[in-house]
């Protein structure tokens, strides 16, 4: 997306004298969870910088050190490339009260976390995009580029030991290409459990409490 235009004149209709202009929103308040504290911080930094917005992070208290380290890394690179000092900021000692305060003070909110935090973002009085629990399945059908699909799923699922909720938790494959996809997964280092192994895993991950 390097060449994708995100600011300035996007379209111009000279016949009607109409221009579509993209402009920054301002300062983004970003709520970061403990389950994916670095990748989400980096992602939100990049999309904010790409759209010429500043961003301030409220990390999860249990993962504040790595979230802040990730934010500092992106900030240093951005400043070295010519971005203003302080374009990326963070709360050193995060709390629920401070998270609520920055959401109310910012121009927009990007909230990733549990239902309570996402609800707070939507109740902040500012435009908000909330992201809750993942547990996402992936569907591969006949139209897919099988090699790319399988490779992308493996990369996603193995990133950060698969702890990110947005990582694919299951794959649904149409019958016509099932065996082809299965071979590609195995070829790329995946392991397919047999029935006995599946039952052993099921007993560990599923119990009376879910």
Where are each of the predicted segments found?
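ALDH superfamily catalytic-core signature
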Residues: 43, 47-51, 69, 118-210
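Nucleotide 5′-phosphate-binding alpha/beta core
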Residues: 1
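Rossmann-like NAD(P) dinucleotide-binding subdomain of oxidoreductase/dehydrogenase enzymes
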Residues: 6-148
């Amino acid at each position: 997306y390097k060449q994708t235009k995100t600011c300035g004149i996007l379209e111009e209709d000279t016949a009607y004298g109409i221009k579509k202009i993209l402009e920054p929103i301002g300062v983004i308040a970003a709520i970061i969870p403990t389950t994916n504290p670095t990748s989400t911080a980096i992602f939100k930094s990049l999309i904010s910088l790409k759209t010429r917005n500043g961003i301030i992070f409220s990390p999860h208290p249990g993962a504040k050190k790595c979230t802040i380290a990730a934010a500092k890394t992106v900030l240093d690179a951005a400043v070295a490339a010519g971005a203003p000092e302080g374009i990326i900021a963070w709360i050193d000692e995060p709390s629920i009260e401070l998270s609520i305060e920055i959401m109310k003070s910012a121009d927009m909110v990007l909230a990733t976390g549990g239902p309570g935090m996402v609800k707070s973002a939507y109740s902040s009085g500012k435009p908000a995009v909330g992201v809750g629990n993942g547990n996402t399945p992936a569907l591969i059908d006949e139209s897919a580029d099988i090699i790319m699909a399988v490779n992308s799923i493996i990369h996603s699922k193995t990133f950060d030991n698969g702890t990110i909720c947005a990582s694919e938790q299951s794959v649904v494959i149409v019958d016509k290409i099932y065996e082809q996809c299965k071979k590609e997964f195995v070829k790329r280092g995946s392991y397919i459990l047999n029935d006995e192994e599946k039952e052993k895993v099921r007993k560990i991950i599923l119990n009376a409490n879910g």
